[in-house]
Amino acid sequence: MTCQTTVKISELIIPKYQRIFNNRNIRHIILTSGRAGTKSSFAAILADYRLVSDAHGSVVCLRKHHNKLRKTVYKEMLRGINRLKIPKKEFDITKSPMEIRYRRTGATIYFSGSDGIDDTKGIIDEDKPIKLVILDELTEFFERSE
């Protein structure tokens, strides 16, 4: 016997982001708000939702520096899985390499820092094309000294 839980996305994300959640016609989204503005939470819920609802795609999450991945976007993705009430046993969750793979379809969330060009240029998934890229803390990618 399977027990399913219904989760309302509208109860998980703020109204400002609800209209863009399932809009596949929007190709680029830049989320703006202040601190604690739920940008990372929205991105995690969107990525986790896409992971389980699209059997043919994967997700890449990037931060400027590797050393901040585990405590930020990786942790937020795990929190998103909990908020969507998806049992963690449905995923292979690894820290090295840092990935979250949905067992049912093989769709994966890949995590990478962008400390150097070599860190991101090889992220390819032959079986599940990357359909969503999340740049967490976008402003870090455009520091004045670079």
Give, region by region, the residue ranges found by the protein language model.
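Short, flexible loop motifs at catalytic/binding sites
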Residues: 1-146
